[in-house]
Amino acid sequence: MYLRLASKQSLNKNNNMRLFFSCFLLLSIFNVFSQETTTLENTSKVKIDSLYREDQFYFGFTYNTLTNKPEGLSQSKLSTGFSLGFLRDMPINKNRTVAIASGIGFSYNNYNQNLAIYKSDQAPTYSIIDPETSFNKNKFSQVLVEVPIEFRWRTSTYESHKFWRIYGGFKLSYLIHDRSIFEDAQGKIIVTSNKDFNKLLYGTYISAGYNTINVYAYYGLNSLFKSAKIEGEPIAMKSLNIGIIFYIL
């Protein structure tokens, strides 16, 4: 009788141990799955809540042409420009694919042409260089502070920096330095701080492209010159600049 009772107690003890280990194993497995689910949920939340911005720094290169030119004026050499600046990106929709942006930048524009600029009695004078006249260089250049404001559409996502974009806007530019130079075999004539240049320029622009490569075009809405005349006629030339632009960060 005693042996039967001891055997029964031992069997109950073994069953209790098995039950304890089974419960412990189930709790451990549940805890692991719970931690993985929480990690995935947190990762998902980070991506959804990320308030990213795009294309806040830019630099570009342009080929500069002149429109509304006086009769006889031509551009015979390559005229180039360079610009760089900062734009604050401000998304206006939930997916952050539509935005407005505004900022500040600098540009340098160079125009090679055959409009000679001289100074006579401290006042600038202008003339079209005769085609038979030999000269080495004739150009004017400008350095401007730019204030662009633009509307932006793009296919960007938080995960990728490769996307299509179309940006268009309006730009104010303030002239801070100008220089005209005529050079021939006899020497150079240099004119700076020409009061006939328009100090405040404005125009529209557009840029479009994918990832790194974007085409850019700017059209000036007012004349480069404010009060310059040639043979009694106002010089009302405007700028048309076409090139490429790069956006980063």
Predicted regions and their residues:
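Bacterial Sec-dependent N-terminal signal peptides
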Residues: 1-41, 246-249
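Short glycine/proline- and aromatic-enriched beta-strand/turn motifs that initiate or cap beta-hairpins
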Residues: 35-89, 249
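Short loop/turn motifs that connect adjacent beta-strands in outer-membrane beta-barrel proteins
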Residues: 43-54, 91-98, 156-164
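Residues that define the transmembrane beta-barrel architecture of outer-membrane proteins
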Residues: 53-55, 76-82, 141-147, 198-202, ...
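Transmembrane beta-strands of outer-membrane beta-barrel pores
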Residues: 61-67, 104-112, 153-155, 170-178, ...
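Extracellular/periplasm-exposed beta-strand and loop segments of Gram-negative cell-envelope proteins
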Residues: 70-77, 111-121, 126-142, 175-185, ...
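Residues on the lipid-exposed face of transmembrane beta-strands in outer-membrane beta-barrel proteins
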Residues: 84-90, 104-106, 145-153, 168-172, ...
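Predominantly the C-terminal beta-signal and adjacent terminal strand-loop region
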Residues: 193-249
